[in-house]
Amino acid sequence: MIHNDKLYVSAMNGTFVMDLDTDRFQWICRNAQSFTIDREENLWILIGTSLYKMELAHPDNQKHYALPRYGIQFEPKRIMTTRAGDIYFVVLGGGLYRYDKQTDSFIHYSQESGHLLSNYCYNVTETNSEELLVTSDKGVTFLNPFSGNTRFATLGANLPITSIADGCGILVCRNNELFVGGNDGLTSFYREDLDKMEKNYSLYFSELYIHNKRIYPGAVSGGILEEAFPFSKSIRLNYKQNN
């Protein structure tokens, strides 16, 4: 993450900030699963089941949130800041949480409350329309944080990928195209396309060809068709008639 001409990065041996002018790194804390910077110049860091709030101007001024004390028993995966300045993080098995500044606590969004497709969440980001995009083991949730309205896109149905796991990424493009990574590939789509009604086409088969030869009803074609192909309910072919 680049913020105020500085690069913030987490590695196996810790979380660091790099001055882009001098190329010098400074150690901040031990390695984090995820981190974000809010509009008040605070660095929020997820480490295990702990959340740390650190002032960028005064790194020694920190606050520690032991998440199990707030009923968050599972390990968080990703944390982010929205354009409105809200802090959200997803928990694998625990759903989605928002930090409430007024109460200094966390508001929970879950599958049981109807806000999420699944509680097993891997990643979260914000779309250009200020919806939250949350990936999970069942698919993608679009959550409007202001109204609470949701839209679900399930794996294998709305999305051509069949599974999502921890580490699969999300990308929101300027033209509103969305990219979601899965275990079996990458898919892209537009949010508005999910709401388009599928057309119910009435399809029928007009002609039958076997080995580039048109098949007509009657014995001349080997009895494959007893009547015209559009009116045939079924046909039987042998192993030599598979082309």
Regions found by a protein language model. Give the residues of each.
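Residue-level detector of Asp-centered blade-edge/turn motifs that repeat once per structural unit
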Residues: 2-4, 37-40, 81-84, 126-129, ...
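Sequence-structural signature of mature extracellular/luminal beta-sheet repeat domains
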Residues: 4-6, 42-43, 52-53, 58-59
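Conserved beta-propeller blade signature
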Residues: 6-9, 42-45, 86-89, 131-134, ...
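Solenoidal tandem-repeat scaffolds enriched in leucines and small polar residues
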Residues: 7-11, 27, 33-39, 43-47
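Soluble non-transmembrane domains of integral membrane proteins
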Residues: 12-13, 214
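Surface-exposed loop/turn elements that mediate protein-protein interactions on large endomembrane-trafficking
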Residues: 16-20
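Residue-level "micro-hotspots" composed of small/polar
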Residues: 27-31, 49, 63, 67-78, ...
